[in-house]
């Protein structure tokens, strides 16, 4: 794997949060050791308010086990 699990999670979270948001908090929880090549990253928005966006992401290995999960809070920035 060319990038770390944390970097993959952060990139996916930034994608769902959008360019108008800035990270306020990022928490990463790692699963048990295992082969991470070919892992799938998925991110989604849990909740959004006028000023904050709450998002989750996970990396799952090919066999379906959880490699890492993340939760983040983004602050919306006025353009």
Residue ranges and their predicted role:
Residues 1-79:
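Terminal targeting signals and extreme-terminal segments of soluble enzymes
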């Amino acid at each position: 794997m060319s990038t770390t699990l944390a970097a993959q999670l952060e990139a996916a979270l930034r994608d769902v949060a959008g360019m108008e948001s800035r990270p306020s908090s990022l928490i990463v929880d790692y699963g048990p050791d295992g082969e991470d090549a070919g892992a799938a990253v998925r991110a989604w928005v849990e909740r959004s308010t006028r000023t904050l966006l709450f998002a989750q992401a996970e990396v799952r290995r090919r066999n379906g086990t959880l490699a890492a999960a993340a939760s983040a809070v983004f602050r919306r920035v006025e353009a």
